[in-house]
Amino acid sequence: MFVIISLHNCVVISFVLFLFGGNNFIQNFYLPQNYIDQFLLTSFPTFTSVGVLIVLVLCSAFLLLWQGEGVNLR
């Protein structure tokens, strides 16, 4: 069960990294470039790789807690 949760977290983390990557097709296709610039630059002026790591760790912890409800992880 823990292996499945870990694999799912790896997929989610990879998808988040893909979305926050520099030049990718999904970001450029679904969101206009000026909207991306306005939203990201005003919301995340210091959005560095450290910030990405913090967000990924928090998301992974939340997913583990959310999926681990009712599952004895001891």
From Swiss-Prot:
Keywords: Membrane, Transmembrane, Transmembrane helix
Record's GO cellular component terms: membrane
Bilayer topology: Multi-pass membrane protein
Chief localisation class: membrane
Location in the cell: Membrane
Transmembrane segments: 1-21, 46-66
Tissues in which the protein is found: Testis. Expressed in several cutaneous T-cell lymphoma (CTCL) cell lines, in head-neck carcinomas and carcinoma of ovarian tissues.
Additional observations: Cancer-testis antigen containing the epitope FVLFLFGGN which is detected in sera of CTCL patients according to PubMed:12839582. Tumor-associated antigen found in several cutaneous T-cell lymphoma (CTCL), and in particular in mycosis fungoides patients and in Sezary syndrome patients. Detected by 5 of 15 sera of Mycosis fungoides patients and by 2 of 3 sera of Sezary syndrome patients, but not by any control sera. Expressed in around 35% of the tested CTCL tumors.
Name of this protein: Cutaneous T-cell lymphoma-associated antigen 1
Gene: CTAGE1
